[in-house]
Design a protein with these regions (language model features):
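Enzymes and membrane/adaptor proteins characterized by extended Gly/Ser/Thr/Asp/Glu-rich
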Residues: 74-111
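Flexible, acidic active-site loops/lids enriched in D/E/S/T/G that coordinate Mg2+ and/or position polar
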Residues: 52-75, 101-105, 115, 135-155
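An N-terminal boundary/leader segment
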Residues: 1-57
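Short glycine/serine-rich loop segments
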Residues: 107-200
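Glycine-rich, aromatic-flanked loop segments that form ligand/cofactor-binding clefts
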Residues: 63-86, 120, 125-127
């Protein structure tokens, strides 16, 4: 399975199943995404913050857990990125607003923590428009995110970086947010599946 070009586009559930069945390793899977990020993200600007070293360390630990036969979370080892507006410890949370350029989160948001508890390897953040208030994804902190199907077009917003990261095969799963179509709009523009989450999920 590890040589298939379709792997980066598998669903999170498919990836988690492959990890459990030892068809692919957690570090091996992460490195596939990191290679694609290096190749494609410069033109897309979907992922705007990342900690590859910490992610590799986490992936190695996840591989050891699989090998040891430990109880695994439902998304064990699946690489994940998350919308910039969600707090993740040590990562910037600016909402694309220059006034908060130097702000870094001191703890995880509920969404981030629940995904981590489910076993994901959260390794980066994705771009948004200023204050999450537009159907495009440009801000003065991180610049513009481009549609993976046509770089001259918008990926939508406000979860534009999220939609692009999924469509371009840069991540295994994403978390966005939606009040006024902020998931629905980028999902449509980028050709991916988007679902509005609920607080109890």
């Amino acid at each position: 399975m590890s040589k298939s070009p379709a792997i980066p586009f598998r669903t999170a559930r498919q990836l988690a199943t492959a990890i459990r069945k030892k068809k692919i390793g957690c570090l091996e899977l992460l490195d596939l995404y990191l290679e694609r990020i290096e190749a494609y993200n410069p033109g897309l600007n979907a992922i705007i913050a990342m900690d590859a070293d910490a992610a590799r360390k986490q992936a190695k630990a996840a591989d050891k857990a699989v090998k040891a036969g430990k109880k695994l979370g439902p998304l064990h080892g699946v690489p994940m990125t998350i919308k910039e507006s969600f707090d993740v410890t040590g990562y910037p949370t600016t909402w694309g607003n220059p006034a908060f350029r130097n702000h870094k989160a001191e703890e995880n948001s509920l969404v981030a923590q629940r995904m981590i508890d489910a076993g994901v390897n959260l390794f980066g953040k994705t771009n948004v428009p200023l204050n999450l208030a537009d159907w495009q994804s440009f801000n003065e902190v991180y610049g513009i995110t481009n549609n993976p199907w046509d770089l001259s077009r918008t990926p939508g917003g406000s979860s534009g970086g999220s939609g692009v990261a999924l469509a371009a095969g840069l991540t295994g799963i994403e978390a966005g947010s939606d009040i006024g179509a902020s998931i629905r709009n980028p999902a449509h523009y980028c050709g991916v599946y988007g679902q509005i989450g609920r607080a109890h999920v």
